[in-house]
């Protein structure tokens, strides 16, 4: 079986996801080939296919720091990618032998490469790679017709502080039907290779796979590149894919403001759209707030969308007293 290897030329998560999908479904279609794909995403939160984006991510922090967000097409939990993290994908023909212990089988050479550098990496549990009982790689898989994809992250020099910052959502306030991410002890490979850079590590890993797998390098044609870019923009970068797939959930929040009193909101969301919203509290409105709630129902549950509506609302103070639009948004989206 012929093996091919490719490294993404960009750090754009939407392009990288689209390229991965193209390699899985279109490259050498109907041929028995193995593909090894390396890629990196700059400053990106990735949620699993079946996760609730709103439940997993602090969207205000992401927006403030200009962090990318996208939903991958495989399952698993939410993760943070930066350029200290390396992603790898291994695509194989779907056979009975491959499907047995797929995670361990497909990542053996990743472990061998690290072991060759005297890094004591091992496969552990169901889908993790560990060093001395600390996780440095989490794996997920996806099946497309006659092919199997196993992909994973490899933490080389990732900034772990970003995990808490962007994924630190108060789960007690969200009754979610999605799958919550589980925090695990993690480690950067760089702790065992302190003099190496991420770029050097990636280069050496590519060389290792090229030699051990006798792999041929893939060069994208202009036609393939155009298809990947189109798919990235129209699908993986779309609101419908990243938010619209979100499970139905109810959000409740309450806050007291010295200038405006107690304020509480209940929001019901289905497929990323507000289907019901109610406001309660002792804020000093002078008119019925029902027209505001009616205006919000049917809108995307999105900070910028709500901000625009509130800024365009005539006589905001008549509805919400001394409460400021940014304070109201903070309650609705759980931002301080």
UniProtKB/Swiss-Prot annotation:
Pfam families the UniProt entry points to: Lip_prot_lig_C, LplA-B_cat
Output the Gene Ontology cellular-component terms. cytoplasm
Enumerate the residues binding ATP: 72, 77-80, 135
User: Can you cite a GO biological process for this protein?
Assistant: protein modification process
* Chief location category: cytoplasm
UniProt GO molecular function: ATP binding; lipoate-protein ligase activity; lipoyltransferase activity
Where in or outside the cell is it found?
Cytoplasm
Pathway recorded for this protein: Protein modification; protein lipoylation via exogenous pathway; protein N(6)-(lipoyl)lysine from lipoate: step 1/2; Protein modification; protein lipoylation via exogenous pathway; protein N(6)-(lipoyl)lysine from lipoate: step 2/2
EC main class here is ligase
Q: Which reaction does it catalyse?
A: L-lysyl-[lipoyl-carrier protein] + (R)-lipoate + ATP = N(6)-[(R)-lipoyl]-L-lysyl-[lipoyl-carrier protein] + AMP + diphosphate + H(+)
Q: Which InterPro entries match?
A: aa-tRNA-synth_II/BPL/LPL, BPL_LPL_catalytic, Lipoate_protein_ligase_C, LipoylTrfase_LipoateP_Ligase
EC number annotated for this UniProt entry: 6.3.1.20
Which positions are annotated as binding (R)-lipoate? Answer: 135
Residues forming the BPL/LPL catalytic domain are: 30-217
Q: Which UniProt keywords apply?
A: ATP-binding, Cytoplasm, Ligase, Nucleotide-binding
Q: Which family does it belong to?
A: Belongs to the LplA family.
More details: In the transfer reaction, the free carboxyl group of lipoic acid is attached via an amide linkage to the epsilon-amino group of a specific lysine residue of lipoyl domains of lipoate-dependent enzymes.
Q: What does this protein do?
A: Catalyzes both the ATP-dependent activation of exogenously supplied lipoate to lipoyl-AMP and the transfer of the activated lipoyl onto the lipoyl domains of lipoate-dependent enzymes.
**Mind telling me what this protein is named?**
Probable lipoate-protein ligase A
Please spell out the taxonomic lineage of the organism that makes this protein.
Bacteria, Bacillati, Mycoplasmatota, Mycoplasmoidales, Mycoplasmoidaceae
């Amino acid at each position: 079986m012929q093996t091919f290897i490719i490294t993404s030329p960009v750090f754009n998560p939407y392009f990288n996801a689209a390229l991965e999908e193209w390699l899985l479904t279109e490259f050498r279609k109907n041929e028995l080939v193995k593909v090894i794909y390396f890629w990196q995403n700059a400053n990106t939160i990735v949620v699993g296919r079946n996760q609730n984006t709103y439940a997993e991510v602090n969207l205000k922090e992401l927006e403030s720091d200009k962090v990318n967000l996208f939903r991958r097409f495989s399952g698993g939990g939410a993760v943070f990618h930066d350029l200290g993290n390396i992603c790898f994908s291994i695509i194989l023909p779907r056979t009975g032998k491959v499907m047995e212990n797929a995670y361990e089988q497909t990542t053996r050479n990743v472990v061998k490469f690290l072991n060759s550098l005297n890094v004591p990496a091992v496969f552990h549990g169901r889908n993790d790679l560990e060093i001395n009982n600390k996780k440095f790689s989490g794996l997920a898989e996806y099946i497309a017709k006659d092919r199997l994809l196993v992909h994973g992250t490899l933490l080389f020099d990732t900034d772990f502080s970003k995990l808490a910052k962007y994924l630190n959502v108060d789960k007690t306030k969200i009754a979610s039907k999605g799958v919550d991410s589980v925090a695990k002890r993690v480690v950067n490979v760089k702790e065992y290779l302190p003099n190496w850079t991420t770029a050097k590590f990636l280069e050496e890993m590519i060389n290792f796979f090229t030699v051990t797998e006798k792999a041929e390098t893939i060069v994208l044609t202009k036609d393939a590149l155009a298809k990947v870019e189109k798919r990235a923009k129209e699908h993986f970068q779309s609101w419908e894919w990243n938010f619209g797939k979100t499970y139905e959930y109810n959000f409740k929040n309450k806050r007291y403001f010295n200038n405006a009193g107690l304020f509480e909101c209940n929001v019901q969301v289905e497929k990323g759209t507000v289907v019901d919203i109610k406001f309660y509290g002792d804020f000093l409105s002078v008119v019925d707030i029902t027209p505001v709630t009616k205006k919000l129902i049917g809108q995307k549950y999105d900070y910028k969308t709500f901000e625009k509506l509130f800024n365009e609302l005539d006589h905001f103070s008549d509805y919400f007293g001394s409460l400021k639009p940014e304070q109201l948004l903070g309650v609705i989206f759980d931002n301080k």
